[in-house]
């Protein structure tokens, strides 16, 4: 979510994320950087500097290495929703460890977003954003 915010977001005091199923701090910073985010790895977290002037994230699709970490895979599935281009998550079946139905429900969520944009967003905004989101729904 910090990629969507204006300004600087600091995640700190998260030492334990270095010793979970994977080094989640390192993997998050690596993959966010791969998607175009301005991320700085710190000892106990990371810093995200917004590249957006109007809170619209500036992320692009990428191949995400989740290192068989279910939480990383789910995080980047969500991040990929608003990225330009396709986001591919390697070994995404690792989510079955904690949330076996995640991707089925996720597809349903993407369909809700598509319906919302087609029904409630003005044609002016829809032209610019709907195509971007629709591209990521397929």
Regions found by a protein language model. Name each.
Residues 1-138:
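Short, structured segments at the rim of ligand-binding sites
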């Amino acid at each position: 979510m910090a990629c969507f915010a204006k300004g600087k977001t600091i995640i700190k005091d998260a030492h334990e994320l270095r010793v979970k199923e994977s080094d989640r701090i390192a993997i998050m910073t690596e993959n966010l950087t791969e998607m175009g985010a301005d991320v700085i790895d710190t000892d106990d977290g990371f810093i995200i500097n917004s590249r957006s002037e109007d809170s619209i994230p500036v992320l692009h699709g990428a191949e995400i290495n989740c290192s068989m970490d279910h939480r990383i895979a789910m995080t980047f599935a969500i991040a990929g929703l608003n990225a330009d281009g396709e986001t591919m998550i390697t070994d995404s079946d690792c989510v079955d460890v904690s949330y076996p139905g995640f991707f089925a429900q996720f597809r349903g969520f993407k369909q809700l977003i598509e319906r919302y944009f087609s029904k409630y967003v003005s044609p002016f905004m829809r032209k610019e954003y709907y195509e971007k989101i629709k591209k990521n729904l397929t």
